[in-house]
Amino acid sequence: MSPFVPGSSLRIEGSAGGPLAGLTFAAKDLFDVAGHPTGGGNPDWARQNPVPTRHAWAVQTLLDAGCTLIGKTITDEVSLGILGENAFEGTPLNPAAPGHVPGGSSSGSASAVAQGLCDTALGTDTGGSVRVPASFCGLFGIRPTHGRLHLTGMLPQAPSSDTTGWFARDAATFARVSSVLLGEPIPEARPAKLIVATDAFGFAEAETAAALAPALERLKRLIPDWREEVMAPQGLSVWGRAQRTLQPVEAWETFRTWVERDNPRFAFSVARGLLLGAAVPEVERGWAALMRQEARGRLRHLLPPGTVLAMPTTPFPAPKIGLPLPMLNPIRDAILCLCAHGGLAGHPQVSIPGARAEGRPVGLSLLAARGADTLLVRAALAVEAA
């Protein structure tokens, strides 16, 4: 199915002569485009909120750089989803694994790039919404350092975790777009040290870990100074529980006024997520906030300048479309356990394609110190060329 928002049609030419001239992009339907409704994946949000009069910062930045906007893409409702299935707008095609989910919530953006309909696409990442689709669709994808990019004109979900992100099929395009959005050139120097997160590779399914082994070996040859470490001493499942607590609480705070005022329609899983956020006890919030500080301290210790950490982006490849809810809950929980560090600690992360498990793509991720986003892009270029 099409990755674009049903019934929408737009094309806005980029500025002539910019560094991205000749490239095209799509924008997740959380980004404002002047004169077009921001739907957020929910028909009532689009109907009950005003049409924006200005472009989102990320959209304007790409247009100013010469990139041409060709459409707005489907998202999980109000970005509350990790698999990419939208009850109102459908599930965008995953061309790398037909019959399987594209990953979410930036599902349409990943699908559009993977299908070759555009060169790059904007997504958002709170609990994995760029990293997961990048892994499932076989793309380069980035979750930048939290707070590095302006989020003006982007519909929020959980502000303490929200970031803008983007996708590309090849490392060269990924680097061009990254340099523009990050506002600095990609450095020539590669990372000096590599950490292999043994707990993350152990958490992934055996076939996924095995599929990533050749890429990991190439990375070790590129960065000979490497060692193994446990990323989450408290346990990846503990970090997952903390993010699973904090994110719905903030999502409820973000959307509470709208929900109580306008009584919008939601799919069951989205409504449940919002209501769970409303019901989290104060003691649980306090515990989760403490775990966030633990995660931040651990990654700050592991990732001094010049060091990168390698881990699987997702614990397994894309699941089938339309699985029943009892099967989906453990799948979502497992994915979040490998993605929670992004929302908790805010470090930049790049997912690199190139491996397949069970015939479907899986990504290898690299993390770096906060602010070292372009170092990760350089590493992605080196891995693709190796």
What spans do the regions from the language model cover?
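Short helix-loop capping/hinge segments that flank enzyme active sites or metal/cofactor-binding pockets
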Residues: L23-G40, T245-M291, P353-R360
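Glycine-rich, small-residue loops and helix-cap segments
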Residues: K28, G286-A386
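Gly/Ser-rich catalytic/binding loops embedded in alpha/beta enzyme cores
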Residues: M1-C118
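Short, hinge-like loop/turn segments at secondary-structure boundaries
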Residues: N86-G90, G138-G141, T245-L246, M327-N329, ...
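Structural helix-boundary/capping segments
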Residues: M1-S2, D64, T120, T126-G202, ...
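Acyltransferase
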Residues: A209-E229, R256-R261, R285, A289-G306
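General beta-strand structural signal in soluble alpha/beta enzymes
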Residues: A27, L69-K72, L122-T124, E228-E229, ...
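Gly/Ser-rich, acidic/histidine-flanked active-site/gating loops
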Residues: F25, S179-P248
